[in-house]
């Protein structure tokens, strides 16, 4: 904990509000709320935490806080700040999953549509439905029963829907407002669980058609009734009062939370939504934020009633959402809440089991890799890759995998210092030397295996440093790629020979991940270096920008990149206008290719 944080912790007030955690670049990485700021913020820096919270705390270098006059103000402000800053440690609600609704448009001649967007346009919306198939089946049934207008724009003549009895053709014939309203009322009644009455009417019409010997019509009505029963089949969980409800069950363990939302529509459980995410506040506070964002940010329609556990601040949620909030204590409602919480607990347990299984599989892959190359299991693997274009701005990068898992905090970047021109072997010798001379000097653990992105020459260069210069016996292997730049072969030994590995094995997949990761890290660093080098040299070559002026500009703007992004007007405040124009045009006329 740095001095800045220590000093700020001593000044925290005993009031509600929001806090914004920042990393070393000043980027906001987490936003939270608190009933008592002093207690909540201090808790991050005292006592023990789960691994997720430890990771967050490890990145915090500073924080801000905003005092509010009430808890509800703190909650509203938290939602605003999360939306504005999009901090990486705040839970991300799913944007890509929206449920379908059936819509009756607010038009002179209404239409029946399926939509995933609910708007305040005067239309009637029914749902959500569990999936597009369920909504489509219901709409098809209603189209057969109620011939509302189908075309988006009125055609000049009747369409196919008129001929099959699914449209009254208001484009050609007069359809009264009363007729349209009657159909809208019937559809509304049907979708609000009045299908039993409508089914009875259809049954009477079917029997009448049979009595009149109109067997084709009777069969048609019989099929319609069967379709209705299929579409509107009652589910196990149903309520007699037909109230629309959302039930929020949650469970948490090991720094993770699962929230299951049960959608109850017209008294029936039609669908659930599952979210699993790491959390960093008190569990009840995290759930409160989740529910608020669920409705305020993601366009979910608020039902007439919400069920939540007793640990949630009922009054605060009620004030924020302006809807009825219930904490069931007995009976069918409590059973439904318990069911949601049980499902949440099971989903979380399943996630942990999958994580554990994946970890076991990864560790097993590490052990099998060791067996394949004839060494002990390489639990710590360090991989190197060089990157340059014809020897320009040469760099190298190293990644670390422990038990098959990337350790990104241990990754390292190297600018090549001693090698001139495109000398890949010389670059490899330099970075391997720099890495392991330092580890030996600092008495830090050496890897069990060194992986080189390259073939025989790169392997030999690395072994020359490890074995001949440093006298270490660390196994070194190389990864060769095919003509499509994909991991192709594992090379080992002196001279290197191909180690046979099944391409669909977990150990081969592990090597592929390592090679892809070190290449990604190296190429990203090289692009950054090239861009910086381009800007720096471009600034140095501008007439009128000498050493003194260059330093003054860098001090004012902070970096060459910021100078490049500055407008001519901003630059003119520090240099003559003509020179400002020259600087702006020179830095922006050419951009390095990625």
Swiss-Prot record:
Keyword Transmembrane recorded: no
Q: Which Gene3D superfamilies match?
A: 5' to 3' exonuclease, C-terminal subdomain (1.10.150.20), GIY-YIG endonuclease (3.40.1440.10), UVR domain (4.10.860.10), UvrC, RNAse H endonuclease domain (3.30.420.340)
Q: List where in the cell it is found.
A: Cytoplasm
In terms of InterPro entries, this protein maps to: GIY-YIG_endonuc (IPR000305), GIY-YIG_endonuc_sf (IPR035901), GIY-YIG_UvrC_Cho (IPR047296), RuvA_2-like (IPR010994), UVR_dom (IPR001943), UVR_dom_sf (IPR036876), UvrABC_protein_C (IPR050066), UvrC (IPR004791)
Domain GIY-YIG, by residue range, is 14-91
Recite the UniProt keywords alphabetically: Cytoplasm, DNA damage, DNA excision, DNA repair, Excision nuclease, SOS response
GO biological process, any: SOS response
**One Gene Ontology cellular component:** excinuclease repair complex
Mind telling me which SMART domains this protein's record contains?
GIYc (SM00465)
Q: Per the database record, which ranges form the UVR domain?
A: 196-231
Which PROSITE patterns would you find in this protein's record? GIY_YIG (PS50164), UVR (PS50151), UVRC (PS50165)
Membrane keyword on record: no
Molecular function (GO) terms for this protein are: DNA binding; excinuclease ABC activity
What is the recorded function of this protein according to its Swiss-Prot or TrEMBL entry? The UvrABC repair system catalyzes the recognition and processing of DNA lesions. UvrC both incises the 5' and 3' sides of the lesion. The N-terminal half is responsible for the 3' incision and the C-terminal half is responsible for the 5' incision.
Assembly and partners? Interacts with UvrB in an incision complex.
HAMAP family annotated for this entry? UvrC
Family indicated by similarity: Belongs to the UvrC family.
Instruction: Name the chain's protein.
Output: UvrABC system protein C
